Swiss-Prot record:
Protein name: V-type proton ATPase subunit E
Gene name, Swiss-Prot/TrEMBL: VMA4
Pfam families per the UniProt record, alphabetical: vATP-synt_E (PF01991)
GO molecular function, one term: proton-transporting ATPase activity, rotational mechanism
Membrane topology field: Peripheral membrane protein
Organism this protein belongs to: Candida albicans (Yeast)
Length: 226
C-alpha cells in the first residue's frame, strides 16, 4: 500500500527529528568527553607546572640556604682569623717587651753578671768537658771574665773536676743581640746556645700555653688538656 504525501512527510519529519536528536546526543557526548579530556589535560598541566614551580622554588631555596651558610661560614672564619691575629699581636708585644727588658738588664753590670754566671755554668755542665770557650758580645768581655771565674768554681763543686773556660776573642756575638753567651766544646764542633734571645725563645715556647690561658682563657675549640 502506497503512502500518501502526508504520511511520507510525517515519516520524514520523524526521521529528521530522530536524526537531530541523535546528533544532539552525539554532540553532547562529544562535548562531555572533550570537556573531560580538557579537565584531565588541564589538571595534568597544572600538576606539571606546579611541580616545576615547586622544583624551581626548592632549588632557589637550596641555593639561598647554601649562599647563607657560605656567607655565615666566611664571616665566622674571618672573625676567627681576626681574633687569632689580634691574640698573636698581643703575644708578640709581650715577648718584645720582655726582650727590651733583657737588654736593659745587660746594661746594668750588677744585674747582668749573675745572669752570665748562670748561663755559662749551665752551658759548661751540658758539655762536661775540661776545656771550653765562650762567645760573647765584645762589650760584654769584662763582665764575662768575672762571671767565668764564678761559673768555673760552681762547675767544679758540681762536676767534681776543674774546667778551663776562655773567651773567644776572634768570634764575638753580634752587638745588637740582647746578650748572653754561646759555649763551645774543646773540638769546636759542639755549641750550646745560651744567648738571651735563644733562652727567651725557649721560654716563650714552653710558657706560651700558660700565657694564652692566662690572657684569653680556655680555648672553646680545644677538647683535651694536659
Amino acid at each position: 500500500m502506497a503512502l500518501s504525501d502526508e504520511q511520507v512527510k510525517s515519516e520524514l519529519s520523524k526521521m529528521q527529528a530522530f536524526i537531530e536528536k541523535e546528533a544532539k546526543e552525539k554532540a553532547k557526548e562529544i562535548k562531555l568527553k572533550a570537556d573531560e579530556e580538557y579537565e584531565i589535560e588541564k589538571a595534568s598541566i597544572v600538576r606539571s607546572e606546579t611541580a616545576a614551580i615547586d622544583s624551581t622554588y626548592e632549588q632557589k631555596l637550596k641555593k639561598a640556604s647554601l649562599a647563607q651558610q657560605i656567607t655565615k661560614s666566611t664571616i665566622g672564619n674571618k672573625t676567627r682569623l681576626r681574633i687569632l691575629s689580634t691574640k698573636d699581636e698581643v703575644l708578640h708585644e709581650i715577648f718584645d717587651e720582655a726582650e727590651a727588658e733583657l737588654k736593659k738588664i745587660t746594661k746594668d753590670k750588677k744585674q747582668y753578671k749573675p745572669v752570665l754566671v748562670g748561663l755559662i755554668e749551665e752551658g759548661v755542665l751540658a758539655l762536661m768537658e775540661p776545656k771550653v770557650s765562650i762567645k760573647v758580645r765584645e762589650q760584654d768581655v769584662d763582665v764575662a771574665k768575672e762571671a767565668i771565674t764564678e761559673a768555673a768554681k760552681n762547675f767544679e763543686e758540681k762536676a767534681k773536676f776543674k774546667v778551663e773556660i776562655s773567651i773567644d776573642d776572634k768570634n764575638f756575638l753580634a752587638k745588637d743581640i740582647a746578650g748572653g753567651i754561646v759555649v763551645v766544646n774543646g773540638s769546636g764542633k759542639i755549641e750550646v746556645d745560651n744567648t738571651l734571645e735563644e733562652r727567651l725563645k725557649i721560654l716563650s715556647e714552653e710558657a706560651l700555653p700558660a700565657i694564652r690561658l692566662e690572657l684569653f682563657g680556655p680555648s672553646t675549640t680545644r677538647k683535651f688538656f694536659d
